[in-house]
């Protein structure tokens, strides 16, 4: 069970995200930037994923299955080193912003609401694409 974070402990959004991730993942704040792989369930309307990417700078594998993320723009542009991305059942409607994942090699986006693949053409390194259960 997660501990509550006291308001006095939080200085800004970056600090709040660090504390939340540290508690949720069970690691020290100083070790967050070293994590190569994580699995989270988030609602991009409530959680600032741009800041999360700035904190998790070494991240190469990101699993966000069963999250609420309707488009890649909601994730931001800070996950530059992610090579493998899992986003099954996330209510994704469009792929605009996918090019922010500059190193993306594997994309698992099954059972979403995707009906257009145009933006996938910007993913130069992509070798694996799972679209099962989409409208394409």
Where are these regions (language model features)?
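Leucine-rich repeat domain C-terminal region
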Residues: 93, 111, 115-119, 124-136
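The feature captures the LRR N-terminal capping module
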Residues: 1-88, 93, 106
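Phosphate-binding glycine-rich loops and adjacent basic patches that engage nucleotide phosphates
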Residues: 12, 102-107, 133-136
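Low-complexity, polar/charged sequence tracts that form flexible coils or short amphipathic helices
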Residues: 52-54, 75-78, 97-100, 110, ...
């Amino acid at each position: 069970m997660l501990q509550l974070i006291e308001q006095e402990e939080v200085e800004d959004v970056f600090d709040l995200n660090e504390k939340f991730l540290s508690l949720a993942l069970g690691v020290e704040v100083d070790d967050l930037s070293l994590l190569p792989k994580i699995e989270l369930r988030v609602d991009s309307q409530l959680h600032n994923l741009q800041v999360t990417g700035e904190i998790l700078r070494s991240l190469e594998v990101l699993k966000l299955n069963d999250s609420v993320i309707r488009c890649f723009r909601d994730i931001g542009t800070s996950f530059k080193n992610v090579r493998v991305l899992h986003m099954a059942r996330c209510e994704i409607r469009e792929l605009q912003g996918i090019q922010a994942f500059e190193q993306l090699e594997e994309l698992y986006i099954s059972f979403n609401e995707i009906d257009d693949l145009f933006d996938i053409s910007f993913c130069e390194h992509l070798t694996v694409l799972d679209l099962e259960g989409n409208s394409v």
